[in-house]
Regions:
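Catalytic cores and adjacent flexible loops of soluble metabolic enzymes
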Residues: 1-194
Length: 194
């Protein structure tokens, strides 16, 4: 509440609820959004920014709009869900949903054209989106760089990746620690040899 009172003194255009890991449940989102709405000045827009590690971005955005809060709501999205790792909420999905369910008038042919002309080559070059390794990081509450390391550097099978990720201690989950993950990988490799 103290944070929101300070935000009210600044009176920014918007305040965001952010799911950095991509594991926010609809129930938790509702709890945070309603608690924020009670304290946040009504002139401040409420924004939702989600990562799509567990494929929850779209359902959480729909749940956010369904709360029918009496303020301006913003949902952050990107074309084709472009974003680091598992990506973000796809603009094309949420705009189509808002057109169908809230009488919005987003120009879907234009959005699809942008996907073809501006985004598809980035996707081919860099890739992003659902990956079981990012899913596991979200499930275990870990920084997504752990998945990136296992995927790009170690190329571990999912079973071994899961074992390594489960071994990360609670106090080391929020920040990527390369020496920790390397030691855990060595430990798992040694166990599989025996």
């Amino acid at each position: 509440e103290k944070l929101l009172n300070n935000v009210n003194m600044i009176l920014p255009y918007a305040f965001s609820i952010v799911d950095s890991i991509g594991a926010l449940s609809a129930q938790s989102l509702e709890k945070y959004a309603l608690a924020t709405d009670r304290v946040l000045d009504s002139k401040i827009s409420l924004c939702l920014h989600t990562h799509n590690s567990m494929q929850l971005s779209f359902s959480n955005a729909c749940a956010f709009f369904a709360l029918n809060l009496k303020r301006n709501l913003i949902v952050d999205s990107s074309l084709y869900g472009m974003g680091r790792g598992a990506g973000n909420l796809p603009t094309e999905s949420i705009c189509d949903y808002l057109n169908q369910n809230y009488s919005k008038e987003y120009d879907m042919p234009l959005i699809y054209s942008l996907l073809d002309t501006c985004i598809s080559h980035f996707y081919k070059a860099f890739g992003w989106g659902f990956s079981l390794k990012y899913y596991l990081c979200a499930k275990f509450g870990l920084h997504p760089d752990y998945a990136l390391y296992l995927f790009k550097t170690k190329n571990l099978p999912l079973g071994l990746s899961s074992k390594v990720l489960r071994m990360i201690p609670d106090d080391r989950k929020d920040t990527f620690d390369i020496s920790l993950i390397e030691n855990l990988c060595k430990q798992v490799f040694e166990e599989t040899k025996n």
